């Protein structure tokens, strides 16, 4: 997750996204029900809750459609039997993952701004300002800073399971399979499209209207 000798893109894409993920739990389907004193309290307006549920509902629907690749291959002869991710079971962790990546991207951008002597870098958190700061990252080994961020994020979820365990996890684990903690999240982040030039027709393309942003 973290290497003190690694460059910023790698660490923000690794431990940065994990820290952001944990912060995000304070505002997920469960954490959002508690106030600043840790008391169970509906501190949101009805409109806030309605909008939150609409966005989380869209994320649940996305994840309900996912089948782990290894299980899709296992059930290739009868795809209707292939087990899917449970979007409702995993929604809290998916909110954490999505928020964590967006938080880490902003933090990385602000770090780049400060390194360039822009003391007011954190004053403008607009998408355009964040993208402009990220574009100042030096290229390394043929990859931009933004690309290295996403490559690092993907690398922290590398895993391999037996088919039986993969199926069991779908039933009991509130975390999504690793491939969807990466690809499922990245497909909802506009900066991922900028990083790798993802366009309509590519496997990870989601139309802008279908991309979910909780926060």
Label the model's feature ranges.
Residues 1-16, 26-215:
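Zinc-dependent metallohydrolase catalytic domains
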